């Protein structure tokens, strides 16, 4: 017995309309108003759009207001007029946002990578990792080449005398980081394999130098020490290997995998709460950094060409090169994808930290762009560690800039050395503010350029580093989108799934017997439609 379809009335009840497949669809009041051309439907559309993009709009407005507020306070006397106590209170909301984000970096990175590595079968893990590293390597090389080309074309360091005279006191040459190239790469290898996982959560290994008197001769001796700063590279490597080990345990590792997945989900709930505070923190972070600068106008006047070269390179790579790569492989609109991650991009600009932006980026690519959790939570932490397109581009521009300041010519061999060294050193660049400047000394030493001029780079790094971070996290997100597209196409072509996600929604009672239906460590071979899967059609992936 078929019931009569509901009929619309003047009180706003939905009316039934036939669909193409013979069914009935309910037309809402908004749809009826839009069909009639009334203004009510337009207002409702605008209201829904504002509600859906409220956080994005608030974040963009926060950046604009932060710049205006910072320039206004700077024009009224800046940090000197405020005094130390008022300045500390002025930047406190931004400091609070950084502390909230850094608080959840460690559990988020470790739990997401363990859960992600454990939810992929070994073959898919290797393929996804290889494609991700290839994408990161190619885009970093393209960014480095673009940086060198722009610096050679625009000649930002041509007016060396004026820049040295005006900004020479902005930093101290003695404080510039000086490290041998070999020791830098050895430190990178040491940090990949930390000797203590607990200390790796807040310290990393770094080589320093001290002069010793050996047989009447002053010799520079390398001395290893632990320095402040999370060794995120070592934690990433350990988490991936530990996740693979849990997968190898089979049913015995399911309970621990579910624990890490649940821990990760709880962390993402915290992220969703922090996101609504992000606009306030970003506004005061941007404003506070502008207020702390002594003379913003002078720096822009003297180093404007260098700043323009860096920002132009980041804009070209982020708005043209990366979207073009995404479009060529996915045939989808890349700018629609970028619109879904506007909030993390603005957060990256405000915090100047790829690691601090990681929680927001995970949530946005999953909810707004449809990237699967086991992909985003596996790829994005790796990208935040090894993918530094913005840093590589900035380092190449800075190296050519310093060469022009020093009036040293760059031949073909030196240019290739800059490209290769910038790409390699950016892999180990920490996802923290000013991380790129710390590795710039490696490039300068590789091509025998003076390290003293790094003080000029530090004078404007507060702005360039923010642009670098935006480009870095954009590359991470687009890489996750590309891998999601690759997985979708591969699963359609193959007769068996490549990715087997561990079901974290199972009840957390004592470890049950490995039943056939809910065991995520078994591959199910689908037969013809309607046929039941028998035990002989299942094969363990272990």
Swiss-Prot record:
Protein's cellular compartments: Cell membrane; Melanosome
Membrane-related topology note: Multi-pass membrane protein
Residues in the Cytoplasmic compartment per record: 1-52, 118-131, 250-258, 330-334, 366-374, 484-542
Extracellular side: 83-95, 155-225, 287-307, 402-414, 449-461
Region feature (Disordered): 509-542
Record Gene3D superfamilies: Sodium:dicarboxylate symporter (1.10.3860.10)
Binding site for Na(+) 1: 383, 387, 472, 476
Residue ranges of the TM segments: 53-82, 96-117, 132-154, 226-249, 259-286, 308-329, 375-401, 462-483
Catalytically driven reaction(s): L-glutamine(out) + L-serine(in) + Na(+)(out) = L-glutamine(in) + L-serine(out) + Na(+)(in); L-glutamine(in) + L-serine(out) + Na(+)(out) = L-glutamine(out) + L-serine(in) + Na(+)(in); L-threonine(in) + L-glutamine(out) + Na(+)(out) = L-threonine(out) + L-glutamine(in) + Na(+)(in); L-threonine(out) + L-glutamine(in) + Na(+)(out) = L-threonine(in) + L-glutamine(out) + Na(+)(in)
Intramembrane region ranges (chain numbering): 335-365, 415-448
Positions contributing to Na(+) 2 binding: 385
Modified residues (N-acetylmethionine): 1
Pfam family, one: SDF
Gene Ontology MF terms in the entry: antiporter activity; L-aspartate transmembrane transporter activity; L-glutamine transmembrane transporter activity; metal ion binding; symporter activity
Subunit architecture: Homotrimer.
Stated family: Belongs to the dicarboxylate/amino acid:cation symporter (DAACS) (TC 2.A.23) family. SLC1A5 subfamily.
PANTHER family in UniProt: NEUTRAL AMINO ACID TRANSPORTER B(0) (PTHR11958:SF19), SODIUM/DICARBOXYLATE SYMPORTER-RELATED (PTHR11958)
UniProt protein name: Neutral amino acid transporter B(0)
Protein species of origin: Macaca fascicularis (Crab-eating macaque)
Lineage, uppermost ranks: Eukaryota, Metazoa, Chordata, Craniata, Vertebrata
Annotated gene: SLC1A5
